[in-house]
Each structure stands twice: as structure tokens, then as C-alpha cells.
């Protein structure tokens, strides 16, 4: 018999009207703290976007309170079991937008958005000809895992996506467009923007990758790698039938699914690397970052100037 883990991680969003995001954020933070939840929740006039962790009892109380608030009627929680908290602290922050597109004329998903496809329909659509699959996430998310045949827009943040589409419109013209993201919130706006731009056949994965991976029928099939998540777990599995590693070590190109942040705080780039290469390259993505006086790996491990010089010499020699 399957054992239930003592903690849960909740992932959810809802486009709805919140009149005073600042006031709501302060009250919601106090409520979350009273339940001893930990997580990161963004609040805007257009709605709420959150992920938080707690015990089964704590998360049940939270979901009950949210469901009893008329503003969040119909909200859907994606639930993962966990052995402990997925966050260190609890943050609830007001924001101008739930997802940052910074369009002059913003998209309201209640007014315009792409067609919703449930996992089975999305699975079937991916196999059709004349279909283009666009990953609406950032480059480092794609590098860890993605749907087979998906296009990787060369972007570092979501707000760069519209410009990338305009520069590569020949890839999409006359095609059926499928979009997907982690939980669905980015695609609500992105697919709506595509429709407004004049693309006629635009669909989005309802509930995102997380829902697709839990679907009992598709079982995450056609997904390679893992799904990047914005908590201490970093990655979660999607494909229940086979696990194909697509991530590549930043330094050697070998298969890798272990993310670290570059040790130079002014860079902080997410890089895939093994524990061995983390030590060898001082957890820095480049020579410039390795020699940074603020290199966190050097400080954390209390390395002397001689030890750093020896490490740099070894890298230079290709050893």
C-alpha cells in the first residue's frame, strides 16, 4: 500500500480581481504565517499566483479558506506530496503583473486566450503534422526538460517572448500552434497574445506540465528530462514511462540534471553541472566569474589565494 508523505506542495493561480493587492498581500501573509506555511505568492490586481508548502493539515486549511473566498471560486490546486517544506520562508508580494510581459496593451485571459487542451488532447495534437510546439518558459527551464520536438525560444525571461515571436514569425505561419508552461499561467496570456497577433489556430496545455505529468492516461509521455520548479526541489519528474536525460553539463556536455547558481552573485546564472565540476570550476560559469572577489564558492569553502590559483591553473591546463 502506498504511503502518504507528511507534507504537500501546492501550485496554483487564478486570474481574478483583487482591488487592493498591497492590503491583500499583508493580510494573506499573516494568514499563511498563522498556518505555518512556507512559500512564494504573488498578488496583483489581475489575480494570484502561488506555490507553498506545509503539512497535509496546514495545506487543507489553506485550500479550504481559498475555496471559501468568492474571489477564488473555481481555483484549482496542483498537489505534490513531499517529505518536508519546499521553501525556507513565506513571502506574499504585491506585483504590477502576475507574469511579466510588460505589454503596452495588456492581455486579459478572461477576454482572449488560446483554446484549452486537456493532457490527452495535447498529446494527440503534438503528434499531428503542421503543428508547432512552443515552450513558453525560460531557456534554463527548457534545458532541463521539454516536450519532444518543442521549439526553444532563445530568451532569458518571459517578457522577451513576444519579440522573439515577431522575429521568427515564419516558423509559425500557417501552422497549428501549441503552447505550454509549468502550471499554465504564462500560457493564458501568451496564447491570448498570439491570438491577438492574428494567429488563428492557437492552443494551450490546460494545467501545464505539472498536470500533464500526473494525468493517468498520458503519464507524461512525449516529455524528455525533468520539469524545473521554483522551489528547493528544483526539478520534478514528468514522464512516468521512461526517463530521458536531456540536460547537459555546462562544462563537459555530459548528461546532467543538477542545477546550481553561478558563484558570482553579480552573475547568478543557473548552470547544470556535476558535483565534481562544481568543485573543479569553483561553481562559476566563466573565468571572469571564477576570479570575482565575491565568488561565493571560494568564500563558503574558505579557499586561500594559493588554492584558487592552483584551481585556475588546472583548468587552464585542461586537467
Curated annotation (Swiss-Prot):
Active-site residues, as the UniProt record annotates them: 181 (cysteine persulfide intermediate)
Entry protein name: tRNA uridine(34) hydroxylase
InterPro entries xrefs: Rhodanese-like_dom, Rhodanese-like_dom_sf, Rhodanese_C, TrhO, TRHO_N
Keywords: Oxidoreductase, tRNA processing
SUPFAM superfamilies with a match to the protein in the record: Rhodanese/Cell cycle control phosphatase
Residue intervals of the Rhodanese domain: 127-221
EC number: 1.14.-.-
SMART domains per UniProt: RHOD
Short name of any one Pfam family annotated for the protein: Rhodanese
Family as reported in the entry's similarity comment: Belongs to the TrhO family.
Coiled coil regions in record: none
CDD domains named in the record: RHOD_YceA (cd01518)
Source species taxonomy: Bacteria, Bacillati, Bacillota, Bacilli, Bacillales
Function: Catalyzes oxygen-dependent 5-hydroxyuridine (ho5U) modification at position 34 in tRNAs.
Catalysed reaction, written as an equation: uridine(34) in tRNA + AH2 + O2 = 5-hydroxyuridine(34) in tRNA + A + H2O
Record organism: Bacillus cereus (strain AH187)
Gene name of this polypeptide: trhO
GO biological process, one term: tRNA modification
One GO MF term attached to the UniProt entry: oxidoreductase activity, acting on paired donors, with incorporation or reduction of molecular oxygen
Amino acid at each position: 500500500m502506498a504511503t502518504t508523505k507528511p507534507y504537500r506542495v501546492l501550485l496554483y493561480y487564478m486570474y481574478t480581481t483583487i482591488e487592493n493587492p498591497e492590503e491583500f498581500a499583508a493580510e494573506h501573509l499573516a494568514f499563511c504565517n498563522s498556518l505555518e506555511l512556507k512559500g512564494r505568492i504573488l498578488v496583483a490586481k489581475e489575480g494570484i499566483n502561488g506555490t507553498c508548502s506545509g503539512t497535509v493539515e496546514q495545506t487543507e486549511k489553506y485550500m479550504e479558506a481559498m475555496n471559501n473566498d468568492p474571489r477564488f471560486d473555481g481555483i484549482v490546486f496542483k498537489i505534490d506530496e513531499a517529505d518536508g517544506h519546499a521553501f525556507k520562508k513565506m513571502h506574499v508580494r504585491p506585483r504590477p503583473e502576475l507574469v511579466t510581459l510588460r505589454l503596452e496593451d495588456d492581455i486579459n485571459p478572461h477576454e482572449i486566450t488560446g483554446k484549452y487542451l486537456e493532457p490527452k488532447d495535447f498529446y494527440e495534437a503534438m503528434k499531428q503534422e503542421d503543428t508547432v510546439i512552443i515552450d513558453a518558459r525560460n531557456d534554463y527551464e527548457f534545458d532541463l526538460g521539454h516536450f519532444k520536438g518543442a521549439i526553444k525560444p532563445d530568451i532569458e525571461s518571459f517578457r522577451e517572448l513576444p519579440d522573439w515571436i515577431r522575429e521568427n514569425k515564419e516558423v509559425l505561419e500557417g501552422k497549428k500552434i501549441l503552447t505550454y508552461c509549468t502550471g499554465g499561467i504564462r500560457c493564458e496570456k501568451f496564447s491570448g497574445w498570439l491570438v491577438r497577433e492574428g494567429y488563428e489556430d492557437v492552443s494551450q496545455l490546460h494545467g501545464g506540465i505539472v498536470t500533464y505529468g500526473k494525468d493517468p492516461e498520458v503519464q507524461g509521455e512525449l516529455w524528455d528530462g525533468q520539469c524545473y520548479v521554483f522551489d528547493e526541489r528544483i526539478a520534478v519528474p514528468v514522464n512516468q514511462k521512461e526517463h530521458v536525460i536531456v540536460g547537459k553539463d555546462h562544462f563537459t556536455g555530459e548528461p546532467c540534471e543538477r542545477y546550481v547558481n553561478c558563484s558570482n552573485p553579480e552573475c547568478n546564472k543557473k548552470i547544470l553541472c556535476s558535483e565534481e565540476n562544481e568543485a573543479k570550476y569553483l561553481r562559476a560559469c566563466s573565468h571572469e566569474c571564477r576570479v570575482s572577489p565575491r565568488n561565493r564558492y571560494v568564500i563558503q569553502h574558505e579557499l586561500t589565494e594559493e588554492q584558487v590559483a592552483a584551481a585556475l591553473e588546472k583548468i587552464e591546463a585542461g586537467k
